[in-house]
Regions:
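Active-site-proximal binding-pocket segments
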Residues: 1-11, 16-29
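C-terminal, helix-dominated tail/subdomain
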Residues: 10, 25-116
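Acidic-residue sensor for enzyme active/binding pockets
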Residues: 15, 56, 120
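Single conserved hydrophobic/aromatic residue that forms the stacking wall/gate
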Residues: 115-123
């Protein structure tokens, strides 16, 4: 199982790196083209985020249809998705939608850390 866990960890870290790069690119684009960053575009992004959360909720409901997974409940995953959505919105310079103050799945921070230490992969 260690191999499978490592694959999941790498996948999460890879997606985190992609997200951080896209946010940096977006912020640079807006900095260089401030006229595009208007209230209409900001509302579109916020509405798109809310719609994505609706779809995520439907997926989580389906995934947890038969009950929770040891150590996780559907409600925690939904709150985590909202927590991350708020983080991404603020990284884009937008207001939070959900106001989830504390990470409901704090162990995910360790998984999403983007820089692997060499000794972690040699065991």
């Amino acid at each position: 199982m260690k191999g499978m866990g490592q694959i999941v960890t790498w996948s999460v870290r890879d997606e985190t790196l992609h997200t951080e790069s896209a946010i940096r690119l977006f912020r640079t684009f807006v900095e260089e083209n401030p006229s595009v960053w208007n209230s209409e575009v900001q509302k579109e992004i916020i509405n798109a985020c809310a719609k994505v959360i609706e779809h995520e909720d439907a997926f989580i409901d389906l995934a947890f249809e038969l009950g929770g997974v040891e150590g996780m409940e559907a409600s925690e995953v939904k709150n985590y998705i909202r927590y991350i959505a708020d983080r991404r919105l603020t990284q884009l310079g937008l207001p939070e939608l959900f106001k989830i103050e504390k990470n409901p799945l704090p162990w995910m921070d360790a998984v999403s850390y983007t820089h692997l230490r060499a000794h972690e992969t040699k065991r």
